[in-house]
Structures are given as structure tokens and as C-alpha cells.
Amino acid sequence: MHFVEAKGLLTGSGGQYGMNIYRGCTHGCVYCDSRSACYQFTHAFEDVEVKQNAPELLEATLRKKRKRCMIGTGSMGDPYLPAEKDLCLMRRCLEIIDRHSFGVSPLTKSDLILRDLDLLSRINSKAKAVVQMTLTTCDEALSRIVEPHVETTVERARALRIFRDEGIPTVVWLTPILPFLNDTEENVRGLMALCVEAGVKGVIHFGMGMTLRESDREYYFAALDRHFPGLK
């Protein structure tokens, strides 16, 4: 992990913006598209870049904006990485989003997001908060292989139910579907059953498969060779 003083935080325009407080990830997911060379990481993917001045940048930007909109986060790094537990940069950004009455939609695989349930509830009451979470497999043993450092599917499903009970809408990313690993009808039906039970408002499949772009492809194939010899 390394810290930087970023020059900017928000990207996008119009009705929706994005931000990445963390760039890179320590979840270790073998299928992660964010490893792709097209994103031009100048550091090792696991050496997470932390924008330590993110709250200050967000405050300065939102203070100038007259039109309220949604702010998404989590495309280039989970906003609730283990480091967030101590750094609290995401929480500080949520406080700013709440203060300026903007909406927010974080994408995560971590139930650490429950720490910020109070802020997300407040934002949802004034603007809109939509929690997005990725689910890939009902097989916890497989999950430990393909996404080794994230919460279990059971723990993530529990978090979704808690948000449901708090009236905060949720969306599930049912992706990726990995050939010969989690592509069974039993698995897809099991994940959909968890979504129904949690009352999610939408399911995103994003084509279901992987992009297999440069760097992402090599990392995934190496993982297949280690854990599932001959499958590649």
C-alpha cells in the first residue's frame, strides 16, 4: 500500500460521477478485470494506491456543484478494503456526500460496509443510496479459491438482508460466470434464490463472462494452472 496526494477524485459528468479512493485491490480475485493493462496501472495491483486527500478533494468539488447527482465508487478498487477499517476514508467521503445531499452507490464484496449503515440510511432518506454487491458462487470452498480474501457468500447475503430491512435498495452483480467452475444451473439458481430472499432490486450480469484482456487473462490462466490443472 502506498499513499498519494491526488489531483482529482471525481470522474464523469451529468447525472452520475465516479470516484476511486483506492486504486488496486487485495481481495485476490483471480478473475478481476481491473488488472487489465488497459487501465494503465503504474504499480503492482496489490500495492494499493490510497488517495489520502480524497475527502478534501470531494468536499471542494461538491461545494461547487449546483446539480445533485449519484456518485458511484468501487470500479478500480473496493471502497471497503481491509485498510478502510482503520483509514476511514470512505466513511469521511460518505459524511461529505451526506452533508451536500448527493446520492451514492458503492460496489463492494465486503460486509465492512455495514459499519456505515447509519450514513447510508441518512443519505437514502435525503437523496438515494444504492448498495451494490458481487456474488459469484454458493460453493464456499470454490469462493476461497477464486476470491480468497473476501467475505463468504453467506456473509455478503446477510449484509444484503440487513440493507433490505433498513429500506436501502440493493443490486447484485452476478458476475463473472466462469466456465466449468461456477456455471452450473444449481449455482445460478442458488445465487438467484439468495437475491430473492434479500429482496434485491436488480441483478447485473454484465455478459456474465470475463473480458480476458491483457494482464487479466494471464493472471486468470495462471490461477487455473495452479488450482485446476488442465482446465485452461
Region roles according to the model:
Residues L87-C88, S121-M133, N182-V200, D225-P229:
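Short, electropositive alpha-helical surface patch
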Residues G77, S110-L112, L135-D139, P176-L178, ...:
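Active-site-proximal loop/turn and secondary-structure-junction residues that shape catalytic pockets
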Residues M1-Q132, E140-R144, T153, A157:
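Conserved Radical SAM active-site core
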Residues L117, R144, D183, S215-R217:
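Short, well-ordered secondary-structure micro-motifs
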Residues T136-E140, H149, E166:
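Histidine/lysine/aspartate-rich catalytic loop segments that bind and position anionic ligands
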Residues R217-K232:
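Acidic, Ser/Thr-rich peripheral helices and adjacent loops at domain boundaries
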Residues E155-S215:
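Conserved C-terminal portion of the radical SAM core fold
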